[in-house]
Swiss-Prot record:
Amino acids binding NAD(+): A3, L4, H5, F6, G7, A8, G9, N10, I11, G12, R13, G14
Gene3D superfamilies (UniProt xref): N-(1-d-carboxylethyl)-l-norvaline Dehydrogenase, domain 2, NAD(P)-binding Rossmann-like Domain
Signal peptide range in chain numbering: none
UniProt record, GO biological process: mannitol catabolic process
A cellular component annotation (GO) from this entry: cytosol
Lineage: Bacteria, Pseudomonadati, Pseudomonadota, Gammaproteobacteria, Enterobacterales
EC number: 1.1.1.17
InterPro entries xrefs: 6-PGluconate_DH-like_C_sf, 6PGD_dom2, Mannitol_1_phos_5_DH, Mannitol_DH, Mannitol_DH_C, Mannitol_DH_CS, Mannitol_DH_N, NAD(P)-bd_dom_sf
PANTHER family associated with the record: ALTRONATE OXIDOREDUCTASE-RELATED, MANNITOL-1-PHOSPHATE 5-DEHYDROGENASE
Record carries keyword Calcium: no
Similarity annotation: Belongs to the mannitol dehydrogenase family.
UniProt name for this protein: Mannitol-1-phosphate 5-dehydrogenase
Reaction(s) this enzyme catalyzes, per UniProt: D-mannitol 1-phosphate + NAD(+) = beta-D-fructose 6-phosphate + NADH + H(+)
Enzyme class: oxidoreductase
Length: 382
């Protein structure tokens, strides 16, 4: 089995690429970072530091790499069995044109073996969005062939992979936590789904997408925003602060009540899942910077993301949301001179009031109780 993985960054190398290579898949990375590409091609191998109670170094072997904008991409997509991505939601549209050219070539070559594409991004139904970009770039005469032979498989992914230490001299070295979860929608594959240890199949993906978004992502973001306000540098420092921890746990319990109503999760099992995530935030071996985790606050405050979406769920089911409201308020107060969205957010707040800014970003109703509650919480935190 052959695979092409877009994104040779930390998540690509430390999570999805590693699972594919460990499964014996012949793996090629695609990226734009020439230093990483050169190192992968020179060595064909790289170390992954898996950190937890039993820290270990695992070696990934038998990989190579190509530049994302090269014609190699077209030839590879024409022949591989799987394409995966870990590039960031905003980059999917950029890689769609090369994918479309590869799919056209695959059709021209009469290669009727199934091709399955899986976007492994922090977003809801990311592969479905990628498919829309690919269809836009693909001449219409190929659309029917694509529908017959190419599967676009949505997934939910979860593994904390912080950036490499600044003093690391190895461009391929990556550190990951022990925990990982990759869940894919088995109903969307063309042909038989591949057997890849660490990739779980489900026919109820949205339950797992929202479980992860409403718990790991919600908790991670709120820990970062409250942590920054409290002067903490890392997620571990933030979660060890009793005041921060109480709000983070409370927010995950509020979003969890939505999940239990919506998907019928067992309350005791979900409570254990929340505790597992808090334990992951406490991991002393992960240096997870609050400024990094808090980046892109405009995206994180949008209607379909980790703060507003669970809050909308609490309104739908008439459930409490005090801690989620505090988390939204903390997000509005996030400041980072190195993040364009944080700068834009600060600019919006300098020109207009909190309620107008929140409504503009999130789509919430300006006259709603929840917007009034966020304004009150911002004033209390500021």
């Amino acid at each position: 089995m052959k695979a092409l993985h877009f994104g040779a960054g930390n998540i690509g190398r430390g999570f999805i690429g590693k699972l594919l290579a460990d499964a014996g898949v012949q793996l090629t990375f695609a990226d734009v970072n020439q230093a990483v590409l050169d190192a992968l091609n020179a060595r064909g191998t790289y170390p992954v530091h898996v950190v937890g109670e039993q820290a270990q170094i695992e070696i990934v072997n038998g990989v190579n790499a190509v530049h994302s904008s090269s014609d190699d991409i077209i030839a590879l997509i024409a022949e591989v069995d799987i394409v995966t991505t870990a590039v960031g939601p905003q980059i999917l549209e950029r890689i769609a044109a090369g994918m479309a050219q590869g799919i056209a070539k695959r059709s021209d070559n009469a290669n009727s073996r199934p091709l399955n594409i899986i976007a492994c991004e922090n977003m809801v139904r990311g592969t479905t969005q990628l498919k829309a970009h690919v269809l836009k770039a693909l001449p219409e005469r190929y659309h029917a062939w694509l529908e017959e032979h190419v599967g676009f498989v949505d997934s939910a992914v979860d593994r904390i992979v912080p950036p490499s230490a600044a003093d690391s001299s190895d461009p391929l070295e990556v550190t990951v936590e022990t925990f990982s979860e990759w869940i894919v929608d088995k109903t969307q594959f063309k042909g038989e789904p591949p057997t890849i240890p660490g990739m779980e199949l489900t026919d109820n993906l949205m339950a797992f997408v929202e479980r992860k978004l409403f718990t790991l992502n919600t908790g991670h973001a709120i820990a970062a925003y409250l942590g920054q306000l409290a002067g903490h540098k890392t997620i571990r420092e933030a979660i060890m602060d009793k005041k921060v921890r109480a709000i983070v746990q409370g927010a995950m319990e509020e979003s969890g009540a939505v999940l239990i109503k919506r998907y019928g999760f067992a309350a005791d099992k979900h409570a254990a899942y929340i505790q597992k995530i808090i334990n992951r935030f406490e991991n002393p071996y992960l240096i997870d910077d609050v400024e990094r985790v808090g980046r892109q606050p405009l995206r994180k405050l949008s209607a379909g993301d980790r703060l507003i979406k669970p809050t909308l769920g609490t309104l739908e089911y008439h459930l409490p949301n005090n801690n989620l409201v505090t988390g939204i308020a903390a997000a509005l107060l996030y400041r980072n001179e190195g993040d364009p969205q944080a700068i834009e957010l600060a600019g919006l707040l300098s020109r207009q009031d909190v309620a107008t800014t929140l409504v503009h970003i999130s789509g919430l109703d300006k006259d709603s109780d929840v917007v009034k509650a966020v304004v009150k919480a911002v004033n209390a935190l500021a």
